A protein has these predicted regions:
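Long amphipathic alpha-helical scaffold regions
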Residues: 54-55, 63, 75-76, 80-81, ...
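N-terminal "cap/leader" segments of large eukaryotic alpha-helical scaffolds
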Residues: 1-56, 73
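Leucine-rich repeat
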Residues: 38-39, 79, 121, 164, ...
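Recurring C-terminal helix/loop segment of individual leucine-rich repeat
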Residues: 43, 83, 122-125, 168, ...
Length: 558
């Protein structure tokens, strides 16, 4: 360490004149000390006040520059040295050096900046604001044959791409082309992984998704899938997962998805379809997720159902009923749910037996699968009276729905169960379905649903309760009383925040339950007439008209 102190003193003197040779030998001594004991040497360099001298030594014309940048990179491996490096004003001269043509200068400068800003979002954001992204992308293009420089750029991109503020800057460069070109040249697993690590965060941006698709990334990914699908090695399995996951990510953008769909004629779309019958779980998963993404608009959904995709998904689900893979089940159900959204698809999918296959998963204890199963059935029966009737009289299904209506730990499952229960009644308008729901204990849940914070759910509940009251009031009477239906309706009508349709359907329901003696008594005891008469002046004509009718009914039966 004595040599180091001596070298540091010399460096202080030498840096004031421009005796390059003596500076070089001092720098060599510093580097040697850092290699031997980085922490101790770094402390010494800081204590001797050397950091403020370094900006002047970072001169693009000087032969010392790569060594100075290397020293900074070594010191900044220590967390405690990063702030002092920033305070000494090292970042601006280092950024200037990124315009150098000297590959060694570029490499050491990149290392220095990377180490100083390691793990600091605020410093990385500063680099982005100072315009390093376009500079680094240009470097990658010019020096793509230099492995060390390429790796330095990739590590920098990987760190910067995590920041949201970087995406816009990346999108304005030709990063997509550069990365795809680089990817095509790689044969080593590690190098491909490095590029994947940059691609994944970048591909979260919709503009960059499209650029990557246009640059030919999808073809590269399909090639990786082809090479690794039958591989047993760990790296093959990892690459297959990364490539297929990235493929699905690209489909999350509307423009990139439509470009790859190509009206259902696209070769990429066809390849993805072939993944569904594969024996590889990862590919089955990616294939089903890709279909779910392609099924984000009605045109695509209609085309896919017409070309027989439903059968492939049902066969896939059938393979996963026993000892099934939960992620595959979830993905295939997501795809079916999306495909069932257009009205013209519903009857075709019902005829293909979708409901029967979906019901095989009723026993699943996995909330994500339960959630998608419920959503798929709800989409299928929308406007389909016959199917709603068939499912609504299925005692096992209704029993399970009632059970899930109490799944307090899983709000999504609870909400979807309530909505499906209501939908079975609303779309079937069947006395048999109402009877099944009453016997299964579903009425109290529909009353609770009417108090939901989501207006759409409140409304669905009120319409279903109205149908129960109209179709079988006698059988429902006890449950209505037990669930305090009348006081719930009183609250909804008194609450100024209730939407017009909530007020309207609550009044319809009040009229419907008047035929029951105990419910009628409750209506009288709660002075409904006051609340209803106020609603005659409501700005919504439908509400004010219904208020008049309800008031007449209440007066006549009081």
């Amino acid at each position: 360490m004595d040599n180091l102190s001596e070298a540091l003193e010399k460096l202080k003197l030498a840096s004031t004149d421009s005796a390059t040779d003596s500076v070089e030998s001092c720098l060599d001594c510093l580097l040697k000390a850092l290699v031997n004991n980085n922490t101790e040497a770094s402390v010494k360099i800081q204590e001797m006040g050397i950091l403020p001298l370094l900006p002047t030594l970072l001169n693009p014309q000087s032969s010392c520059t790569p060594k100075v940048a290397n020293i900074i990179a070594e010191m900044a491996k220590n967390e405690f040295m990063r702030s002092p490096c920033v305070e000494a004003g090292l970042i601006p001269p280092l950024i200037q050096l990124l315009n150098s043509t000297d590959q060694e200068v570029l490499l050491q400068t990149g290392r220095a900046l990377g180490n100083i800003c390691y793990d600091s979002h605020s410093l990385q954001a500063q680099l982005i604001n100072m315009g390093v992204i376009p500079t680094l992308v240009k470097l990658l293009g010019v020096h793509s044959h230099n492995t060390a420089l390429t790796e330095m750029c990739l590590i920098a991109f990987g760190n910067l791409a995590e920041l949201e503020s970087s995406k816009e800057q990346f999108a304005s460069t030709n990063i997509a082309e550069e990365l795809v070109r680089l990817f095509q040249k790689q044969s080593e697993h590690e190098k491909k992984e490095m590029i994947f690590e940059v691609l994944a965060p970048l591909a979260e941006n919709d503009v960059i998704k499209l650029q990557l698709v246009e640059a030919g990334l999808v073809e590269c990914l399909l090639e990786v899938v082809g090479q690794t699908v039958d591989g047993e090695r760990e790296e093959d399995i990892a690459q297959l997962k990364t490539a297929s996951d990235l493929m699905v990510l690209l489909l999350l953008g509307d423009e990139s998805m439509q470009k790859l769909f190509e009206g259902g004629k696209g070769s990429v779309f066809q390849r993805v379809l072939s993944w569904i019958p594969s024996h590889n779980h990862q590919l089955q998963l990616a294939g089903a997720l890709a279909i779910a993404n392609f099924a984000r608009n009605d045109g695509n959904c209609i085309h896919m159902v017409d070309t027989g995709i439903v059968q492939k998904l049902l066969e896939l689900l059938d393979r996963h009923v026993e000892e099934g893979n939960v992620t595959v089940q979830h993905a295939a159900l997501s795809a079916l749910r999306n495909l069932a959204i257009p009205v013209v698809n519903k009857s075709k999918m019902l005829s293909a037996g979708v409901a029967d296959v979906v019901l095989k998963f009723l026993q699943s204890e996995m909330p994500p699968v339960q959630f998608k199963l419920l959503g798929t059935l709800r989409m299928l029966i929308d406007t389909q009276a016959e199917a709603a009737d068939q499912l609504g009289t299925n005692g096992k299904l209704v029993e399970r729905l009632v059970e899930w209506c109490e799944a307090k730990d899983h709000a999504g499952v609870m909400g979807e169960s309530n909505r499906l229960l209501s939908a079975l009644i609303r779309h079937s308008k069947s006395k048999e379905v109402v009877k099944t729901v009453i016997q299964g204990g579903g009425v109290k849940h529909l009353v609770t649903m009417a108090t939901s914070e989501h207006m759409i759910m409140q409304n669905e509940a009120l319409v279903a309760l109205g149908l129960i009251a109209a179709l079988d009031l006698v059988a429902a009477e006890k449950d209505f009383v037990g669930a305090h239906l009348v006081s719930v309706l009183h609250k909804l009508l008194s609450d100024e925040r209730s939407a017009p349709e909530i007020k309207y359907n609550s009044m319809i329901l009040i009229c419907a339950v008047m035929g029951s003696e105990p419910l009628h008594k409750e209506v009288q005891s709660l002075a409904f007439i006051d609340v209803v008469s106020k609603l005659r002046a409501h700005e919504n004509k439908t509400v004010s008209h219904q208020a008049s009718l309800t008031e007449q009914r209440l007066t006549a039966q009081s």
